[in-house]
Design a protein with these regions (language model features):
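Core catalytic alpha/beta fold that binds nucleotide/phospho-ligands
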Residues: 1-225
Length: 225
């Protein structure tokens, strides 16, 4: 499970777990995580959040050689979580979670379950760059392309650790024959060579992406458990 140097491990976990497994996951939570779990009013949202957090602790524990309950998760200045000895990022949508792992570079992950009712054209005009909009509107399957791009852009924000403090129109991503690439990012002169973008196919209709700080990287997709 632990990534090799120069490798990004992308772990896909199902979130509709049995009551027994969810109870075992909850037993690994900190007081802060337990409070967050019970704060959800909707049972499905509560259980899926708990399963995502539990899967994260299981995966981190497996990679670090620790029990899930012993993994100490800390938070950076922009709220990005981290642990000693491993870089990671978590995203979840619908009934799936995506966990990106690395031993030597910052990573960001995003997974999305495309929703038919979302007004994707309006969202694109608001949040994408002019170049991204032009390529999106020229694509054959505009809705599918929208979610592919959305995942890549979200993953970049999470890789930099800036989150919502950076505008989604302050950087541009382009799809290529072999995947995707970052063209530019305001405030990061070497952005195009500094970050690698990896669109992923997690299956079951989901879209996903991982962005990592570094070049010459490889990805490995893993199903959990």
């Amino acid at each position: 499970m632990k990534p090799r140097p120069g490798e990004i491990v992308a772990v896909v976990a199902g979130l509709d777990v049995s009551p027994g497994r969810l109870a075992a996951m909850r037993a690994t939570f900190t007081a802060r995580e337990a409070a967050r779990f019970v704060s959800f009013a909707h049972e499905e949202h509560r259980n899926r959040w708990g399963a995502a957090r539990g899967a994260l602790r299981e995966v981190l524990g497996a990679a670090l050689g620790q029990a899930p309950a012993d993994v100490e998760i800390r938070y950076g200045p922009h709220g990005k979580p981290y642990v000693d000895g491993l870089r990671f990022n978590l995203s979840h949508s619908g009934a799936r979670a995506l966990i990106a792992l690395s031993v030597d570079c910052e990573v960001g992950a995003d997974i999305e379950l495309p929703r038919e009712r979302r007004r994707t054209d309006d969202i694109a005009r608001r949040f994408f760059t002019a170049g991204e909009i032009a390529r999106l509107f020229a694509s054959v399957d505009r809705k599918a392309e929208f979610f592919r791009l959305w995942c890549c852009k979200e993953a970049f924000l999470k890789a930099t650790g800036e989150g919502l403090s950076r505008s989604t129109r302050s950087y541009e991503i382009e799809f290529t024959a072999s995947g995707a690439r970052l063209l530019w990012a305001n405030g990061i002169p070497d952005a195009a060579t500094r970050y690698s973008v990896f669109p992923l196919d997690p299956g079951d209709g989901y879209r996903a992406a991982v962005v990592a700080e570094g070049g010459g990287l490889k990805t490995r997709l893993v199903r959990w458990p």
